[in-house]
Each structure stands twice: as C-alpha cells, then as structure tokens.
Curated annotation (Swiss-Prot):
PANTHER family: RIBOSOMAL PROTEIN S19P FAMILY MEMBER, SMALL RIBOSOMAL SUBUNIT PROTEIN US19M. GO terms for cellular component: cytoplasm; small ribosomal subunit. GO terms for molecular function: rRNA binding; structural constituent of ribosome. PROSITE patterns: RIBOSOMAL_S19. Residues 83-94 have a biased composition (Basic and acidic residues). This is Small ribosomal subunit protein uS19. GO terms for biological process: ribosomal small subunit assembly; translation. HAMAP family: Ribosomal_uS19 (MF_00531). Belongs to the universal ribosomal protein uS19 family.
Amino acid sequence: MSRSVSKGPFVDLHLVNKVLSARQNNDKKPIKTWSRRSTILPDFIGLTISVHNGRQHVPVFVTENMVGHKLGEFSHTRTFKGHAGDKKAAGSKR
C-alpha cells in the first residue's frame, strides 16, 4: 500500500539539510547517508548520494526518472551470484 497523498513524501531532515547546503555551495562531493527510507525529491536531481547498503556506501547519481522512488531501491543489499546451472551441459559446448 502506498503512502497517503495528504501526508506527503518522507525524507529525513538531516538529508534535506545536506542537500540544501550542497546546492548553496555548488558542492559536487557525494552526500553520504544511511537513510535508505527517504524518498527522492526533485531537489536531489543532479547530485550524487552515497547510500549505505549494510556494508559500504554505493554512489547513486540522481536523475529525473528516480523522483518519487526511495534511495534504498538503487543500493542493493544482496549480491546476486547467478543461478546454478548444469555444469555438464555448459562444459560440452564448443
């Protein structure tokens, strides 16, 4: 179920403050955050936000298509190693 329109999007206050200060100073350094739950606002477009995935910070360059999504959607927490395959069939191909 999605969030009520009357409530508005959720963004952590400390992240908004960091984005506004980066905009004022024309700072291009990545903004480091642990807030995966924050919604991407139009103010974030063009900035690089380093989102923590539980192990490291993954740089996410915010584009226009990302507005309305959560930051955590672009910083995966699990590494996909691939599905198990038939090793006999894979080895016999030439």
